[in-house]
C-alpha cells in the first residue's frame, strides 16, 4: 500500500507544480480599471496574466497579455468573422514595436512602428481592395512626410500640413 501512495504522490506532484507555473487566463469582464491599472474585479492587486474577450456569437474578439496591471506583450484581435484584425506589441501599457492590422476580408489594412506609445518610423495603410492608401514617416508621434494614393492605385496630392516650403 505504501508503494501505491508513493507512486500516486510522484505522479501527481509534478502535475500540480506545472499547473502552478501557468499564468491565469481571465475574461476581460473580470478586470476593472483602478487609477490607470487593471485589477481583477474586487481586488486592488495589479493583474498579471492573460485575458480574452468574446463576441456575442462566441467568436474570440481579443487576447491580451498583462504585467502589473498594464498591457505588456502581444495583443491580438479578431474580426467577428474570425479573420485576424490586428497584432500589436505593448510595453508598460503603451504600443511598442510593430503593429499590423487587417481588414475583415483578410487584406492588410496598416503596418506601423511604435516606440514608447508614439508612432516612430514607417507607417503604411491600404484600402480594403489591397491598393496602398498612404505611406509616411513619423518621428516621436509626429508625421514627417507622407504620400497618398486613390483606390485605383494612382498617386494623389492631398494637403499635408507637415510639409514646409
Where are these regions (language model features)?
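Bacterial N-terminal signal peptides that target proteins for export
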Residues: 1-8
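Bacterial N-terminal signal peptides
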Residues: 8-16
